[in-house]
């Protein structure tokens, strides 16, 4: 886990945003895309 943070420090931020956006963004995009 520590190695991942050093290799990809932006992944930690992306994961947090993806989890948060996954609920709103993904749901909205999926509904609109359909």
Curated annotation (Swiss-Prot):
Biological process GO terms, please?
regulation of translational elongation; transcriptional attenuation by ribosome
Q: Which UniProt keywords apply?
A: Leader peptide, RNA-binding, rRNA-binding, Transcription, Transcription regulation, Translation regulation
Q: What induces it?
A: Induced by ornithine; putrescine does not trigger ribosome stalling and so appears to repress expression. Part of the speFL-speF-potE operon.
- Return the InterPro entries for the record: SpeFL
What Gene Ontology molecular function terms does this protein carry? rRNA binding
Is Lyase among this UniProt entry's keywords? no
Indicate which residues the UniProt annotation says bind L-ornithine. 13
Region of interest: Effector domain:
14-34
Task: Region Sensor domain: list its residue ranges.
Answer: 1-13
Return the motif ranges for Ornithine recognition loop.
10-16
Q: What is the effect of changing residue 31 to A?
A: Loss of ornithine-dependent translation arrest in vitro
Determine the domain of life of the protein's source.
Bacteria
Extra facts? Changing the amino acid sequence by 2 frameshifts with minimal nucleotide changes indicates the peptide sequence, but not mRNA structure is important.
* Subunit note: Binds ornithine in stalled 70S ribosomes, blocking the upper two-thirds of the exit tunnel. Contacts 23S rRNA and ribosomal proteins L4 and L22.
What does the domain comment read? An N-terminal sensor domain binds ornithine already present in the ribosomal exit tunnel; upon ornithine binding the downstream effector domain compacts in the exit tunnel, causing a shift of 23S rRNA U2585 which blocks the action of peptide chain release factor 1 (prfA), causing ribosome stalling.
Q: Which family does it belong to?
A: Belongs to the speF operon leader peptide family.
HAMAP family reported in the protein's UniProt record: Leader_SpeFL
The protein's role, per its UniProt record: A small protein (arrest peptide) encoded upstream of inducible ornithine carboxylase gene (speF) that controls expression of downstream genes (speF and patE) by nascent chain-translational arrest and transcriptional attenuation. In the presence of ornithine a toeprint due to ribosomal arrest can be seen on the speFL transcript. Only L-ornithine (not other tested amino acids) has this effect. It is thought that in the presence of ornithine, ribosomal stalling on speFL prevents binding of Rho transcription termination factor to a downstream rut site allowing transcription of the operon.
- Report what the protein is called: Leader peptide SpeFL
Species the sequence originates in: Escherichia coli (strain K12)
Gene symbol?
A: speFL
């Amino acid at each position: 886990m520590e190695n991942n943070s050093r290799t990809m420090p932006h992944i930690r931020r992306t994961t947090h945003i993806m989890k948060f956006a996954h609920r709103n963004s993904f749901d909205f995009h999926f509904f609109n895309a359909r």
